[in-house]
Amino acid sequence: MLPVRHGLTVCITGVGPVNAGIALGHMLALCGEYTGVLNLGLAGSFDPARAPLGACTLVTEEIWPEYGLLGDDGIDAPGLGFAQWEHGGLRVVDRLPLHTDLADIGLPRPADAVPGISLTVAGVSADARRADRLARRYRPLSENMEGFAVALACARRHIPCVELRIISNNAGSRAPEDRAFPLALAQLGTLGQNLFGTPPIRLL
């Protein structure tokens, strides 16, 4: 976590849903109230035609496809019988809608952001069969490793959560031509500059 500057606190969570949930929960507990959370990171694309390498995506809904009863036919989230969180009319099992209006948190929306569903996974899709199975079931645009945990932490504190991600790879492939991490990191730095008016952020 970096100090507050101009009303902005930067929380570097590390990789994966466990890291993300712990880091954001710790920050929210220590630093008081926030008007919103912007989750920035990388993602793998299930639809390279809509979201090619280097594209910016705006997450409309987070799905955790690894929560529930696991059998030969896949995951049955409702079958487990337990919601992860309930409040008012909202019952979160494995899906959580996100805010998509960046004005809710006082920021401009990138004109080129492609909207779509994202899956949060602890293990990225490294083969075509897994990627195809997830794509058929959930119709996602992308997959990531932190989004659902961040969104759930925000929901529990009633804080708007917006998620923007740059496509770094094509889900289901580890071929060199389907990965572009240097490009994605450069685009992520430029995105930060455009959102916050700061010099490009170098991400190593």
Which role does the model predict for each range below?
Residues 1-33:
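N-terminal short beta-loop-beta anion/metal-coordinating cradle
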Residues 15-16, 61-64, 166-169:
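Short, acidic/turn-prone active-site loops that include or flank metal/cofactor-
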Residues 33, 52, 114, 139, ...:
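Short loop/turn motifs at secondary-structure junctions
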Residues 35-38:
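Structural motif
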Residues 47-137:
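Mid-sequence, gly/pro-rich, charge-dense loop/helix-turn segments that line enzyme active sites
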Residues 121-163, 168-172:
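A C-terminal functional module that forms or caps the active site or interfaces directly
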Residues 161, 166-204:
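Regulatory input/activation interfaces that engage signals or partners
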